[in-house]
Amino acid sequence: MLTIRLALGGSKKRPFYHLTVTDSRNARDGSHKEQVGFFNPVARGQEIRLSVNEERVNYWLSVGAQTSERVAQLLKEHNKTKAAA
């Protein structure tokens, strides 16, 4: 099953996550089909906290990909901020 989930990047005490489309059986940071955005939980100042390629996310959801719980929360947050702006 295809899953849209977070893959850990960044460095020590400075996490950074890529939103990736991958097979659910692959390792967290293993191979993936496509990167559709990123999430920076410790963004400061002018740094971007969340970036999502909505067109590609919608495509993958339309072909049956499932989101992880955290990614579902992030997409909901992204839609709220987009609607408010």
Swiss-Prot record:
Which species is the source of this protein?
Answer: Pseudomonas savastanoi pv. phaseolicola (strain 1448A / Race 6) (Pseudomonas syringae pv. phaseolicola (strain 1448A / Race 6))
Per the UniProt record, one Pfam family is Ribosomal_S16
InterPro entries reported for this sequence: Ribosomal_bS16, Ribosomal_bS16_dom_sf
Q: Known NCBIfam families for this protein?
A: S16
Gene3D superfamilies in UniProt: 3.30.1320.10
What one GO molecular function would you report for this record? Answer: structural constituent of ribosome
Keywords attached to this Swiss-Prot or TrEMBL record, sorted alphabetically, are:
Ribonucleoprotein, Ribosomal protein
The Swiss-Prot or TrEMBL record describes its family as follows: Belongs to the bacterial ribosomal protein bS16 family.
Question: Which gene carries the instructions for this protein?
Answer: rpsP
The protein's name is: Small ribosomal subunit protein bS16
Biological process (GO) annotations held by this record are: translation
Q: Mind telling me which GO cellular component terms the entry cites?
A: cytoplasm; small ribosomal subunit
